[in-house]
Amino acid sequence: EMGDWEFEVELRNLAGHKFPSGYPSRIAFIEFELQDPDGNTLFHSGEWTPETGVIGRDETWEPHWETIESEDQVQVYEMVIGDVTGAPTQVLERASVLIKDNRLPPRGFSTNHAAYDTVQFGPMAALDANFNRTAQTGEEGSGSDRMTYRIPNDLNAATVQAHVTLHYLSVPARWVQSMFEWAEDSEEIASFQSMFESADRTPVVVATTTTWAYRGFDQNDPEWRLAPSAIGSGQPLRLIPPGETIPLEVVLVDALGRTVRSVTPDAALRGFDVSDVASGAFFVRVRTE
């Protein structure tokens, strides 16, 4: 939507099996944080604390998301099993139905395989056109998931930085909570609870990335713009054209008009690195015809 910040996140499974795999307590979740240039948090999905676990994760089970638009929505990759009544359970002997399974499949995974009924996706992931399908052709077997974070552009920031982290957690506290209710009646459970609560249960970082984004152009603005106007450490420089004008040639020059470097139009529109350029005032010369 016009005026929204929008980021597409793609995860690719590099393992030869579903991720996370093995015992169904294991989860992976995406932490997405949007900050202004001063480091102030503007949006945060998937934050984790020792006291609450994954903030925003639903009490029963979190839906599989294709688009996230609020902080109480978080993408959690997991398998959720249900008992004969359809209620989620952590007791394997009571498992009767598959409520959710959006764990990332390995590359080449096919729903047409003869054994698919034993390793099938949950219903929500199966309906996601971006889950295990390539962006170009829509063919399955990509071993990936693509999702969108859409955030209203009412944050009073022309430049933002997005931090995306994939976390892995082997045993969330809620998985063992029902077992701990029996600690007074079981010395073994009480002993395990003591060890569990004293252990470092910080999620493992699987992958992380950071990117900058800038407020889009106004179709009615007749002027070329650069974003940001003042470059901070590590920030790329982006050329924003008026309307749908496409540059043919882009040159970065210094205050004396000397050429610092030529930039391809594609790189100029996406944002290019200037970290190796000395501090000072610079201009961009653009040719459109």
Tell me the role of every PLM-derived stretch:
Residues 220-227, 232-289:
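C-terminal outer-membrane/trafficking sorting elements
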